A protein has these predicted regions:
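C-terminal accessory subdomains/tails of enzymes that are appended
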Residues: 1-36, 42-52, 64-65, 80, ...
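Short beta-strand segments that buttress and anchor functional surface loops
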Residues: 44, 88-92
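Core beta-strand elements of the Rossmann-like FAD/NAD(P) dinucleotide-binding domain
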Residues: 94-105
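Short, surface-exposed charged micro-motifs
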Residues: 77, 102, 160-162, 241
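Short, hydrophobic/aromatic-rich segments at coil-to-beta transitions
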Residues: 84-88, 147-148
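A conserved short coil-to-beta-strand element within the FAD-binding core of flavoproteins
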Residues: 71-86
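Aromatic/hydrophobic pocket-lining residues that form π-stacking "cages" and hydrophobic walls in ligand
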Residues: 58
Length: 411
């Protein structure tokens, strides 16, 4: 009944209708599914995306429409006029130069770090968030067989387990572990990895091992804390909230990717109201994001640059100008040297970690290959940014520290 309601709500935007699959049809879709006790399955259709690429598309869309976007700039304190926030003192992390940025309205949309910014504005501010760490494992597609995803609605601890084909690999997750504090690069733990392996093996004919995983990664969820102070983060709110401080700083937090536009709408409406700005229609309901295919671009799975949309032509141009850029970053990675150069020139990549984790997803697909690719990426970045060999050495060491922390629980 729930999935039929899902179909009805999707209406014309539905991919296909959900339905029941018998035992044989289920095994045809998921050949490694455990046969004992299997009677059938429910099939439904959903979408997936690359969160890093969507974040870049949103930032570049804003730039296309006149916004100023700065990378590696840290807010150190707010600026005030007559008790109202009117900007921020920020510092360029690379040069150390400080700047004052003035604004009619100030919005704090810093994800898991919103409480740190709120404390800059009001040291007595009550934290809004209870952070949760989610760990995921990545395997070769052959470990599971078939092209379908597997969703288990309720695991041993009452959570959802998923096995999802993604970018030619398979992602398995997730956990939901309460954590104190924040981290730029949270690392998975052996306990979480073993939990995921045990849970997924309960449904597999041929089990996977921890050491079969090509990569492991973790992220922090900005969950809105409940009034009861529950430490069970799976029960905390995934919805977004907006809070306004006494000085007028508008904070938006919580939420999820599927509601990002509504989050932005609510935030801008509140900021405009507080600043006394006149309301005007927003174009974002139908606004094409940067790179949206115009009908002449390839969307084939075999096209290695399909995810770049109309920017695909720039990457092909880089290859024409320098054929060596057609080479992969590593034989086991689906990314080219051209993507690293494009990341620097067009997507504000400044570090090896930027290229291998936040422009491509190499670190999250095959950690060993990403580690091996790091020195070559450092050389490409150094040539683009005018850095010396000492900088390259530091970059590789910094990336190695992150990658080794991710790799440790699966080795």
């Amino acid at each position: 009944a729930g999935l039929k309601a899902y179909d009805v709500l999707a209406g014309k935007t539905s991919f296909h209708a959900s339905g029941y699959l018998g035992r044989s049809a289920t095994l045809a879709e998921l050949p490694n599914l455990r046969k004992a006790g299997l009677h059938g399955s429910i099939r439904y259709f959903d979408a997936q995306f690359d969160d890093a690429r969507l974040a870049l598309a949103l930032a570049r869309t804003a730039v296309d429409r006149g916004a100023a976007v700065a990378n590696y700039v840290r807010a150190e304190r707010f600026l005030y006029a007559d008790g109202r926030a009117c900007g921020a003192l920020v510092r360029d992390a690379e040069s150390g130069t400080a700047y004052e940025i003035r604004a009619t309205a100030v919005v704090n949309a810093t994800g898991i770090f919103v409480d740190e910014l709120r404390a800059l504005d009001d040291p007595g501010a009550v934290p809004l968030l209870a952070h949760s760490r989610g760990t995921h494992l990545v395997f070769a597609r052959e470990a599971f067989g078939g092209k379908a995803a597997l969703l288990v609605p309720k695991t041993a601890d009452g959570r959802v387990l998923f096995v999802i084909p993604w970018q030619g690999y398979v992602v398995v997750g997730t956990t939901d572990v309460p954590v104190g504090g924040t981290a730029l690069d949270p690392a998975p733990t052996r306990e979480e990895v073993d939990f995921i392996v045990a849970q997924v093996n309960a449904y597999l004919e041929k089990p996977v091992r921890r050491t079969d995983a090509l990569a492991a990664f973790a992220g922090l969820r900005p969950l809105v804390a409940g009034n009861g102070g529950s430490d069970e983060t799976s029960k905390l709110s995934r919805e977004h909230v907006i809070a306004v401080s006494k000085s007028g700083v508008v904070t938006v937090t919580g939420g999820k990717w599927t509601t990002y536009r509504r989050m932005a709408e609510d935030t801008i409406d509140e900021a405009a109201r507080r600043a006394g700005l006149a309301a005007r229609p927003s174009p974002t309901a139908t606004l094409a994001l940067h790179g949206k295919p115009d009908g002449t671009e390839s969307s084939a799975e075999s096209d290695r640059y399909a995810a770049y949309g109309t920017d695909r032509s720039k990457l092909l141009g880089l290859e024409r100008d320098d054929p060596s850029l057609r080479e992969p970053l590593h034989p086991n990675l689906p990314y080219t040297r051209a993507e690293a150069v494009f990341g620097v020139r067009d997507e504000m990549a400044r570090t090896v970690d930027d290229v291998l984790a936040r422009r491509t997803r190499a670190l999250f697909l095959d950690v060993a290959a990403a580690r091996a690719a790091a020195p070559g990426v450092a050389r490409l970045l150094a040539a683009e940014l005018g850095r010396d060999p000492a900088w390259q050495t530091r970059q590789v060491a910094d990336f190695e520290a992150i990658a080794s922390a991710d790799a440790a629980p699966i080795r």
